[in-house]
Every structure is written in structure tokens, then in C-alpha cells.
Amino acid sequence: MAQDAITAVINSADVQGKYLDTAALEKLKAYFSTGELRVRAATTISANAAAIVKEAVAKSLLYSDITRPGGNMYTTRRYAACIRDLDYYLRYATYAMLAGDPSILDERVLNGLKETYNSLGVPVGATVQAIQAIKEVTASLVGADAGKEMGIYLDYISSGLS
């Protein structure tokens, strides 16, 4: 079950029936110290999500064989489904970044996704390439530190699909 960083630390101590130890408090301190950065990044991502996805597609997919007749993204319907999926990955990576917990991505995005893509003939490699382009575009908008933080969750999705 997905938990935010705070709940995970507290639940771990609670299961053991003890107060938070130094290591647990350090985890919370690290989480809180990056809180403002994560919120600012999420604000920027939310305000620019469509542009992020559009630019990422242009960088990674638009002029490749995948969008030409016979390619897996050919036809408006398939292209629209790809855009929808990339937006979905960006949104859930943003949620996970705010929570400080990638397990949200397992539960809400990755469970069964690779198998579904393979059964539908969706090219996983091209999808991973587009997610990496989202990571680059996002980092250019939110800055290096927030981009690195967000990159953790986009890389997690890429790894889960690979």
C-alpha cells in the first residue's frame, strides 16, 4: 500500500511499538527540508503539464518511424492515447514526488502496465524514451534541484516499464 514519507516513518515506528529514533527523525527532516522545493516544482508542472508533454513528444517521438503510416502511433486515435498516457505518467510522478514515495507509482501506474502494453503492441522502448524526454523538459522548467527530485520518479516509471 502506498504511503507518503511521513506515514511510512510513523507506521514503521508504530509497528515496533517505539518512539521515532534518530534515523527516523532524520528521514523526516530530509523530507521536510525539500518540501518547499517539491511544492514549487509541482506548481510549475501543473501549470505547464500540456506544454511539457507536447515538447517531450516533439523531442522523442514526433519525427520518428513510430508516427508514420504503419507505425504504432500512427492514426490520431493512437497518438491521442500516447499523449494521454504520457500526461498520466507526469501527473502520477508529480504525486509521488510530493508524497516522497515511489510506491504510489507501483499501485497506480505500473502494476500490469508492461504486460498490457506488450499485449497491445505498444512499443515500450519508445514510451521510455518519451518519459526520459519528459524528465529533461521538466528539469529545464523547474530547475536542477527540483528536476533531479522529479527525475527519481520518472526514472522509476521508466525502470518499471523496461
Swiss-Prot record:
NCBIfam families: apcB (TIGR01337). Belongs to the phycobiliprotein family. InterPro entries: Allophycocyanin_b, Globin-like_sf, Phycobilisome_asu/bsu, Phycobilisome_asu/bsu_sf. This is Allophycocyanin subunit beta. Light-harvesting photosynthetic bile pigment-protein from the phycobiliprotein complex. Allophycocyanin has a maximum absorption at approximately 650 to 653 nanometers. The keyword Electron transport applies. GO terms for cellular component: phycobilisome; plasma membrane-derived thylakoid membrane. GO terms for biological process: photosynthesis. The modification N4-methylasparagine is found at residue 72. Contains one covalently linked phycocyanobilin chromophore. The chromophore is added by phycocyanobilin lyase CpcS 1. The keyword Methyltransferase does not apply. Heterohexamer of two alpha chains, one alpha-B chain and three beta chains. It comes from Nostoc sp. (strain PCC 7120 / SAG 25.82 / UTEX 2576). Keywords: Antenna complex, Bile pigment, Chromophore, Electron transport, Membrane, Methylation, Photosynthesis, Phycobilisome, Thylakoid, Transport. It is a peripheral membrane protein. (2R,3E)-phycocyanobilin binds at residue 82. It is found in: Cellular thylakoid membrane.
